[in-house]
From Swiss-Prot:
Name under which the protein is recorded: Type III pantothenate kinase
Name of the gene: coaX
Protein family (similarity comment): Belongs to the type III pantothenate kinase family.
Binding site for substrate: 109-112, 186
Keyword list, A-Z: ATP-binding, Coenzyme A biosynthesis, Cytoplasm, Kinase, Metal-binding, Nucleotide-binding, Potassium, Transferase
Taxonomic classification: Bacteria, Bacillati, Actinomycetota, Actinomycetes, Mycobacteriales
Length: 272
């Protein structure tokens, strides 16, 4: 059983995966709030409470964090609470198997790397990955499995909350599809701007990528896959996305763990 931990700016996804390679599947998943000042002990108590008896069946752990302070605590937690379980943290120097053809590879978020790795592993062709999180990341993978870069925009919830926070006449609203793109009240107007506006943003970015990037035109076979917590809200309004994979990031973490498994085994033998 593999424990996968995906720490983002606002929420953390904890998953358990059974099996390896093409037989691997997510059997449990939880979503909890990310606390930037959380300690290793607090993390361990939370995760151990979630996974229960499966804690004794762990064969490995893979984790990423877009919050550096939390990544540090995750490392301490794994060393202290599961010292005999091999683990991989996605950070510079870890083998991912995906070339990063960008100006500064160290700047690329671990979440973007594992998403693209998982998309290429699943479809085995050029891909555009759209991750709907606190930011919307639209990333590009070549037909050779190379990370070519991408675009980052503010997330749907973040943008809606910012509009409410900076305007005396607006308030925070539930993210839901309104009756029409033409809202009849303030809540519906904000929902229309969030849902239809960001669907148009994503379709526009994907369309520009297909126009501007060699090998991604409409004449080429390109997988366009969405993931992320708010993706289901926008999927019905998107015209460019072909696939939705709720577990894309967790599967990407598994792939990185498997690619580093031999290295981990070597470290364990040395430790003995």
């Amino acid at each position: 059983m593999l424990l996968a931990i995906d720490v983002r700016n606002t929420h953390t996804v904890v998953g358990l995966l059974s099996g390896m390679k093409e037989h691997a599947k997510v059997v449990q998943q939880w979503r909890i709030r990310t606390e930037s000042e959380v300690t290793a002990d607090e993390l361990a108590l939370t995760i151990d409470g979630l996974i229960g008896e499966d804690s004794e069946r762990l064969t490995g752990t893979a984790a990423l964090s877009t919050v550096p302070s939390v990544l540090h605590e995750v490392r301490i937690m794994l060393d202290q609470y599961w010292p005999s379980v091999p683990h991989v943290l996605i950070e510079p120097g870890v083998r991912t198997g995906i070339p990063l053809l960008v100006d500064n590879p160290k700047e690329v978020g671990a979440d973007r790397i594992v998403n693209c790795l998982a998309a290429y592993d699943r479809f085995r062709k050029a891909a555009i990955v759209v991750d709907f999180g606190s930011s919307i990341c639209v990333d590009v993978v070549s037909a050779k499995g190379e990370f070519l870069g991408g675009a980052i925009a503010p997330g749907v919830q973040v943008s809606s909350d910012a509009a409410a926070a900076r305007s005396a006449a607006l308030r925070r609203v539930e993210l839901a599809r309104p009756r029409s793109v033409v809202g009849k009240n303030t809540v519906e107007c904000m929902q229309a701007g969030a849902v239809f506006g960001f669907a148009g943003l994503v379709d526009g970015l994907v369309g520009r990528i297909r126009e501007d990037v060699s090998g991604f035109s409409v004449d080429h076979d390109v997988a366009i896959v969405a993931t992320g917590h708010t993706a289901p809200l926008l999927l019905p309004e998107l015209h460019t996305v072909d696939h939705y994979d709720q577990h894309l990031t967790l599967q990407g973490l598994r792939l990185v763990f498997e690619r580093n498994l031999e290295v981990q085994r070597g470290r364990l033998k040395t430790a003995r």
